[in-house]
Amino acid sequence: AFLTMQAGGRPVEIELSREETFAFTRVRHAIDFSLKTAVRPDGRLVARRYEAYSNQGGYASHGHSIAANASNAYRHLYQDEQVLDADTYTVYTNIASGGAMRGYGIPQVNFAMEAHMDDVARAIGMDPIDLRVKNCMRQGYVDPGTGITCYTSGLLGCLDQGKKYIGWDEKRKAYANQTGNVRRGVGMAMFSYKTGVYPISLETASARLVLNQDGTAQLQMGATEIGQGADTVFTQMAAETIGFRDEDIHIVSTQDTDVTPFDTGAYASRQTYVSGMALKKTAKVFRARILNYAQYMLKRAANT
């Protein structure tokens, strides 16, 4: 395709068959988990043991980092009295190679973890929601591995409202003693997901704001808009921080990253949290400089 494009001077489309897609591109990793949990009679988690084998296929790709990200996510949702004991292995096999898919190992580990929590609840005769309420991460929780603090959490309120609107208690009672081949059930699961790649790697982001002569601002971001709505979020964050209207912030979705400030890219759901925070800091400095100059020109305080 590259040579054809060079010869003809026009873009060339590569269209793979379904078989070629699975055989010669990347697939999501299949991960086998072995989970053990020590729990007190009241449902409090004491210690957890985690072992995972990630099927990498024939080539490395994102294998080790996805396996590490899965194990890192396993400890986020629930707190236990002891530090999580975890071993993760990447296994090379002769199937299609695993690569970076949406969720980056976390959907696999969350499925295993939530199925395991249901098993624990059943083993001690406890309501699955009550078990989660007793152990889930709360505001103020400090991750023992990264030192990151959870400053806000609406998880308990979400569980309470979900239980109410789904009719959890009523349905569990109604479905308790069923017979026959076709039965009804009610279940729930929680999901946690982090932004960025820290502590596996460092995060870097930057932004530039230029004041135009008409009183609008040009926003330059190295964080790429790929259809996820990042430019809309950046516009709103800049406008709110500076005090401008949204329409007064101009951003080009196809910015040349050779001109914009450096950013590591669009991945890991990082742009609002990481790139957006860089933008917020920039917007605060931008606003302060405008107000300082206004004070100089008008000979009056900015808050008057």
Predicted regions and their residues:
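Structural alpha/beta core scaffold segments of enzyme domains
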Residues: A1-T304
